[in-house]
Design a protein with these regions (language model features):
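Transmembrane alpha-helical segments and their cytosolic interface motifs
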Residues: 71-97, 124, 128, 181-210
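Short, strongly hydrophobic alpha-helical membrane anchors
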Residues: 1-16
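Juxtamembrane "helix exit" motif at the C-terminal ends of alpha-helical transmembrane segments
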Residues: 10-12, 90-117, 202-210, 216-221
Length: 240
């Protein structure tokens, strides 16, 4: 009885072996990139390590200032960006839930697209569920980033004064580490948007889905290691 129910549930998704393979590759690429990117460097160079040093330098400079309004403004601007991203993601999720609520009409529209491969309504619904899941994960990452930025604000408020120089090194390190955690969560949320685009390409078929996932990984790697911004930040962090 239990095996029959499991088989029926698997059939309801209506995914072919190629679809399952492309979906598995997508999950490995998405979650694997998020897990490995903060830890991996290419040719001894990593924008994450460079930015850790830049944030530490920023916090050292901040602790030496009597007036920290500019620093508070910069953090506030970043918090606004995170809040906007979380709000936008909620709107996207609401729209996708609306699609699931009228899946028949949405299926008819999607089937009429020239690039869309033939698919059943169950398969189309599975694809909508996957992209909805991606945006739900993105929302949780943005909201966690926002909470960590709020913790950072509390630490900035409790930071030692310019006269307490013996406490600056440790305080700057703690502030920089917490900021890095908040930024990492925010970056993971942004990357979820990149990978959500891959699921849209899935409408054209599993082969295009797998190819789009590979393309997004290449784009992210170039941004992370090969872009002009990455080189400039690395040069700044490694200068004497």
């Amino acid at each position: 009885m239990g095996k029959d129910i499991d088989a029926e549930m698997m059939m309801s998704f209506d995914l072919s072996p190629l679809d399952w393979a492309a979906l598995l590759w997508f999950l490995v690429a998405w979650l694997g990139y998020d897990a490995l990117s903060p830890r991996v460097s290419v040719a001894g160079r990593s924008i994450n390590d460079s930015m850790k040093k830049v944030r530490f330098e920023w916090m050292i400079e901040m602790l030496q200032r009597e007036m920290r309004m500019a620093d508070a403004s910069l953090v506030g601007h970043t918090i606004s960006s995170v809040t906007f991203s979380a709000s936008t993601t909620m709107i996207v999720i609401a729209g996708l839930v609306g699609v699931l609520g009228d899946i028949g009409q949405a299926y008819n529209v999607a089937s009429g697209l020239r690039f869309a491969a033939p698919m059943s309504q169950s398969l189309f619904e599975s694809k909508v569920l996957v992209i909805t899941g991606v945006f739900v994960v993105a929302f949780f990452r943005f909201s966690w980033s926002l909470r960590q930025y709020n913790y950072l604000c509390a630490l900035i408020g409790a930071a030692p004064s310019p006269r307490e120089k013996n406490l600056h090194q440790r305080a700057a390190l703690e502030l920089a580490k917490l900021m890095t955690l908040a930024v990492t969560s925010f970056n993971q949320g942004l990357r979820s948007y990149y990978f959500a685009l891959c699921v849209l390409v899935w409408l054209a078929g599993p082969g295009w889905f797998a190819l789009a996932t590979f393309g997004v990984v290449l784009v992210l790697l170039r941004h992370h290691y090969g872009s002009a911004a990455a080189r400039l930040i690395t040069e700044h962090a490694t200068k004497p």
